[in-house]
Amino acid sequence: MPKETLVVSKSEELAFEYFLSFNKFSSGSSSFLGQVTKASFFSSLASSGSKSSLNSLNNEFDHLSLYEIKNSSLETEKYKTILVVCDNTDEFYGEKGLSNLTLFHNSLLPNGKFVIAIPPNSSHEQEIKKEMMYSGLIDVVSSVYYFTTFITGVRPNWKSKTDKKSPSMIDAAPIDGYISKAPDYESCSTKPRACANCTCGRAEREKLNSTDLTSDVDAPTSSCGNCYLGDAFRCESCPYKGLPAFKPGEKVILD
């Protein structure tokens, strides 16, 4: 079964100590390692088979040193929790810090928690918190538990938000439910003349054409062909007499 927690420290003993300490801190217990001091705790382990105890607890988490991580690659989206025991805060702020924190961020599962343990009252606490946010972690807070400051951050679960339908993906409502269908009208395009109740526009077109044809037939005609030149060239009975000259073929309306 794959382990859900990674502890990064110089030694397995240190990883064991901070793993238990952080579990106590997370559960809100006021005790530290079960009311047992570090010295008596590890001495009791030595007298009762500490190696087997460490091995059994190591089944709860993976352990790597920061040096091992830098010279290898962490699997992406693998751990629910990553706990880093920091003995050199220089590794976690500035360009070097952002690079290391991004590596841990990418190895967390969505909603996974990153925790870094630093000495209390560290002068670099604010810089580390800022670099954690730059790496993509959210909800970055710090808390002091006994002689350790735990700075925690969460990798956001952006995937769950993208699963929701965006407005552009919402199915459109059928338009037929909002707009009534236009009634079907009989077409007279195949008939010899327009229908009495024509709605396709044929009756209007035929009426317009008939008006143009009538005006052309009723227009006066010239017998001499010089009417357009003006009165000096028109005959006595010219219907255009008294009108100004016009261009040949130009339609002139008579009063």
Curated annotation (Swiss-Prot):
Coiled-coil intervals, chain numbering: none
GO cellular component: mitochondrial intermembrane space
InterPro entries: Anamorsin, CIAPIN1
Sites where the protein binds [4Fe-4S] cluster: C224, C227, C235, C238
Molecular-function GO term, any one: 4 iron, 4 sulfur cluster binding
Binding positions ([2Fe-2S] cluster): C188, C195, C198, C200
Region (N-terminal SAM-like domain), start-end ranges: 1-163
The name this protein goes by in its record: Anamorsin homolog
Species this protein is from: Theileria annulata
